[in-house]
Amino acid sequence: MHAYRSHTCTELNAAHVGQEVRLSGWVHRVRDHGGVLFLDLRDHYGITQVIADADSPAFAELETVRAEWVIRIEGRVKARDASLVNPKLATGEIEVYATGMSVLGAADELPLPVFGETDYPEETRLTYRFLDLRREKLHQNMMLRSNVVRSLRNRMWGAGFNEFQTPIITASSPEGARDFLVPSRLHPGKFYALPQAPQQFKQLIMVAGFDRYFQIAPCFRDEDPRADRSPTDFYQLDIEMSFVEQEDVFAAVQPVIQGLFEEFGHGKRVEADWPRIAYRDAMLWYGSDKPDLRNPIKMQVVSEHFAGSGFAIFAKLLENEGTEIRAIPAPTGGSRKFCDRMNAFAQSQGLPGMGYIFWRKGDDGAMEAAGPLAKNIGPERTEAIRQQLGLGEGDAAFFLGGKPETFEAVAGRARTEIGRELGLTEENCFKFAWIVDFPMYEKDDEGKIDFSHNPFSMPQGGMEALEGDPLKVHAYQYDLACNGYELISGGIRNHKPEIMFKAFELAGYPKEEVEKRFGGMVKAFRYGAPPHGGCAAGIDRIVMLLADEANIREVIMFPMNQRAEDLLMGAPSEPTNEQLRELRLRVVPKD
């Protein structure tokens, strides 16, 4: 018999009754029923109930054990009485009568319990993450993650992709976030960077003549934390393909992601229709470039109904160039109480409020419009709005106005809140959409032209498009949205040096700077580069969706906290003076 176990804690069943066995694991919990001890022994695979009475040679020793001690049990498999069978356990038909016990690893008093799902402060959970990971829910999440990665690999290999590894220490590259810099000991004053993504390397793989590449790639970005984003590092399914257009990438990716969600989606419906939605339409209809299509609400522009109307705030606002009034339909939301609640929500988001109209049955039995806006713009305009939005009695509509960029994000959040409050957002399904035609450029906080997304994407229209207004240039850039999250981002790459130089020039990077920062890739493009494109899927976020978790840290084995600190390992930490001298660095005190 093996030194530690003959079986795992999920293998024993009625067929093993009468056998002598050996099990090892953690003490999940102990119950003393008047001279009979019941002990749940847990390992990676499951739980087995162990019993000992006063006649057992192991009884005295078992009385001393506490939760989370690691022990080895010798004993005999017994059938449970029919009334005591536990159908929730794989081993619920049997129990092991203990004849011997050894302590393999004692445990101090626990800072947080493993048994049960008691909610503990995140700081405590992350400081003792190794204990936190023993809890059933987190253990399941990590196994889900492992199985998702395995499935992704199998699906990519099955689709004819080849897995290659790229460097994880390289040169700094402006890709939209701050780099983590690594000082060079051999080259004082110079720094490497941890890659924000394998972007340049995967493109070089295409230039090198390989056709379909993928890897499960670690990425490093010094970002502000969010519930759906790690502040330091994450993993992505990185993909690149040669001789492809946008639709070719979509056709390769959809079977992989759709199949993955069907495999691990716990029976939730996975929509097979993945619409293409232009970025501008997504912002107009949903107030987001990662719309949740489970919510049927679609916003519309209703400016014509307020221009020159009696509602002076909107009428005057529309006299300014680039402004509009947008409506958020709210089917079944036609009560003043609900409208006031949503108005308060808008105020909590930093807006002065939202105007609203709701339709109800009047005293004469006919439908009438109510609310402050209805009184100001009159029945003809309110009826025109109702017809445009397709609303009826018992429905409502909310209104925001201004330049779209000033209110779209809040309008999107209001749409989400309205759909949730009214029960309009469909549960138990995954709905996907490709967001396409992203703007290539945007203005930064200082009013300068900058890349809005990936700087390596091909502009639609090529060089000719770059000769016009940069803010009107669309890129072959696309995202995949699912249930309100961005799962994938990608693009068709700019593989022609002259177009690349022009694209970067418009964003303020002279040719010399591009040569310096991306010299390897520019050089490669001069030696025969194929048209190519690809994308990257966020694995952490995919697992978060599949696990139905609201916080990405629940699906990462050892995550940082919201201040980008590793409380278990004590990172970041102060370097020693010797380390600083070796790197020829010194720490400058804060002012």
UniProtKB/Swiss-Prot annotation:
Q: Which InterPro entries does this entry report, sorted A to Z?
A: Aa-tRNA-synt_II, aa-tRNA-synth_II, aa-tRNA-synth_II/BPL/LPL, Asp-tRNA-ligase_1, Asp-tRNA-ligase_1_N, Asp/Asn-tRNA-synth_IIb, GAD-like_sf, GAD_dom
Output the Gene Ontology cellular-component terms.
cytoplasm
What one GO molecular function would you report for this record? nucleic acid binding
Top enzyme class, one word, equals ligase
- Please give the PROSITE patterns that the UniProt record associates with this protein: AA_TRNA_LIGASE_II
Question: What is annotated about its quaternary structure and interactions?
Answer: Homodimer.
Tell me, what does this protein do in biology?
Answer: Aspartyl-tRNA synthetase with relaxed tRNA specificity since it is able to aspartylate not only its cognate tRNA(Asp) but also tRNA(Asn). Reaction proceeds in two steps: L-aspartate is first activated by ATP to form Asp-AMP and then transferred to the acceptor end of tRNA(Asp/Asn).
**Name this protein carries in UniProt:** Aspartate--tRNA(Asp/Asn) ligase
Instruction: Specify which residues bind L-aspartate according to the UniProt entry for this protein.
Output: 175, 221, 453, 493
Question: Binding residues for ATP, per the UniProt record?
Answer: 221-223, 486, 538-541
- SUPFAM superfamilies (UniProt xref): Class II aaRS and biotin synthetases, GAD domain-like, Nucleic acid-binding proteins
To which protein family does this belong?
Belongs to the class-II aminoacyl-tRNA synthetase family. Type 1 subfamily.
Important for tRNA non-discrimination, annotated site positions: 33
Give EC number(s), comma-separated.
6.1.1.23
Query: What domain of life does the UniProt record list for this protein's source?
Result: Bacteria
Q: Name one Pfam family in it.
A: GAD
> Which source organism?
Cereibacter sphaeroides (strain KD131 / KCTC 12085)
Q: Which reaction does it catalyse?
A: tRNA(Asx) + L-aspartate + ATP = L-aspartyl-tRNA(Asx) + AMP + diphosphate
NCBIfam families according to UniProt? aspS_bact, PRK00476.1
